[in-house]
Amino acid sequence: MALLEIKNVVKRFGDYTAVNDVSLSVEAGEFFTLPGPSGCGKTTLLRMLAGFEQPDAGQILLDGQDMSQVAPEKRPVHTVFQSYALFPHMTVRENIAFPLKMAKWDKRKIAAQVDELLEDVRLTQFGDRYPHEMSGGQRQRVAIARALVDRPRLLLLDEPLSALDAKLREEMQIELINLQKEVGITFVYVTHDQGEALALSHRIAVMSHGKVEQLDAPEKLYSYPKNRFVADFLGQCNVLEGTVKALHGDAMTVALKGCGDVKCQAVAGVKEGQQGWLALRPEKVKLDKELPELPDEAYFKGRVHDCLYLGDVTLYVVEVADGVLVEAMQPNNIPGVAKFFDDGDVVEIAWRFDAGSFLTE
């Protein structure tokens, strides 16, 4: 049985439906992420899991028990927010111990539990410091330790890293992954950061307009998006309009608008003449001054329209026809492979027939 089950949950604010008939389940010990753009309903859903909002319809089951109308303090659930909400007049140790003191735990048990959490979040030497004496990342770890100290069944995290700088955010992602493995508690994590969702999660439910667009493992979502929204939301993606021209076995020919025919993998239920879009990740596109024309590859000549140097890679935008742009990602640091091109250079691009996904919605 799943630890958490969300069944047909709806939440309205006046005439606005923030969460629209969402159903999903989360397994015990899972790191589950809800990414989506602002206003997609992810935070409202998290607030219902915490008990800060009540659903207008549907059920929220935790260990098989309906929690939809249970008060927040009665749920075995804790929440970590973007703001750390630490008590400034208390030390790190006192902040972490606070929930246990309120629950009237024995002092020796409190001390042992706090010591264990300090070790889990790698802050053993900071127990006697005050919040203002610590970095943002350290304060966030204290907030997480406080939320975990009485071992809740479920930890909710509402964009906890968004206030940190990019480098510290990356470090904290690794800390969170290791911490979740160590404590074994189920995490449900809300973020607008696609990279964060891909890096942290066992599974991801991408949300848009109050609905779950697609739920799967990160690598499946990235490689096999269900629709244009998911393809475009999770990382860089070429989305090229086209029409199915012919079907042949496990492949099909698609006429890309403005630039010619390509082969791609067949999609169940697709018919000749059907319109759609080829979703193609830039790192799957080969780019060079000259490329061999191979039978299982799409091939185009073009001109470099723009280039964006990103350190380890460069993103090239290649115009292959009037107004038709294809992005190609090239590594910069591989000996014998790294090549650089300038705006206006004439180049050739190619990709394997199975490199992209044909989308019908």
From Swiss-Prot:
NCBIfam families hit by this protein: potA
Gene Ontology CC annotation, any one: ATP-binding cassette (ABC) transporter complex
Xref: PROSITE patterns: ABC_TRANSPORTER_1 (PS00211), ABC_TRANSPORTER_2 (PS50893), POTA (PS51305)
UniProt GO MF annotations: ABC-type polyamine transporter activity; ATP binding; ATP hydrolysis activity
Native source species: Chromobacterium violaceum (strain ATCC 12472 / DSM 30191 / JCM 1249 / CCUG 213 / NBRC 12614 / NCIMB 9131 / NCTC 9757 / MK)
Positions that bind ATP: 36-43
Similarity comment: Belongs to the ABC transporter superfamily. Spermidine/putrescine importer (TC 3.A.1.11.1) family.
Annotated protein name in UniProt: Spermidine/putrescine import ATP-binding protein PotA
Enzyme Commission number(s) of this protein: 7.6.2.11
